[in-house]
Amino acid sequence: MKSDKKNTKNSAFLTASFLLFCSGVAALIYQVIWIKQLGLVVGVDVYAITTGVSGFFAGLAIGSAVFGRLADRSPKPLRIYIGLEIGIALLGITATLMLAWAPAWFVALQSSTGVLAWALPFMLVAIPATLMGGTLPPLLAALKPEDASVGRMTGQLYAANTAGAIVGALIT
């Protein structure tokens, strides 16, 4: 009986690791595409990279904090995870399409609002990245690790996500 429970936990952990690996691949593919598109929006690669990376990491941090709290309180954290992944797909595609149209909007905003125009490309990246940042906490909450193994399990899940991010960056 104890062995069956351990096998179920191992299977759930491997599934969560695989999901986070795939999520990492997709996240970095989006990030690389968005940064390339931002170069066309703002016209200077260094500003595009700065805006893209800043928006991406701000979104990741906000998403982890917000959805971590929600996952801790939720009786069904996997539903949160599924909703986040669906939202990432929808917002990721939307952001990619909007970035294709953003150069004209950015120029018009920059003429009228100056530095505030930078909020447009920043937010186009930060909003979907917020959902990306929220994916690990619900999976961790669903696994319900014992207190003694929370740190180790969190690190292993982040490692799976990071490995996916490396693959995503390499194939883009």
Locate predicted features:
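Alpha-helical transmembrane segments of multi-pass membrane proteins
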Residues: 1-172
